Amino acid sequence: TIKDLQRKYNDIPNFHLTTGKIFVDGVLEGDPLSTPPMLPNAASLSDYLQPVFYQKEGIDLVQIERYIDPRAPECKKYFDLDTDKFIKLHKFHPNQCIESKGVFEHDLEFIENYTAALHGAGINVHSHTIGDRAFRAAIDAFESAKKMHPTSQGNFSVSHAQVIHPDDKPRLSDIEIFFAFTYSWIE
């Protein structure tokens, strides 16, 4: 158990198991200019937009021409053509027809159970969240752990929190979450 780990390493000077970290999701950065375009994998509440870019000759600036509608007729033909024919005909990669909301690093049950176990042992829980779906999963787990272990001395913190859905903002003070923002990403 977590308490056993704490006791096992308790005699090591300057080493204390006081905080456990969980990666709820991955990164927001994708590479839409690669072939095929690579989407971010941060867990989002809504599907990622799939841009088609253009670049004027002699100018380094890349601009968005349009976004792909995955429900459009050309995307219905996604499996009918090979990749090169699809790109030539439709001017975008067929993988851009695939809808994605990103992924969690672990399933939700693990996130909730791990958070509850740490909090129940009085250990601080630090969750890495980028997308708004990941942030919501983390604070849902915090709320659940707090209800299960109301006398725990463990705290909750979140790193990055690049995207927070407005509906989740009022919950933050009730849960008492500490934040570790990455300030270089603010602007």
Locate predicted features.
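Active-site neighborhoods of metal-dependent hydrolases
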Residues: 1-187
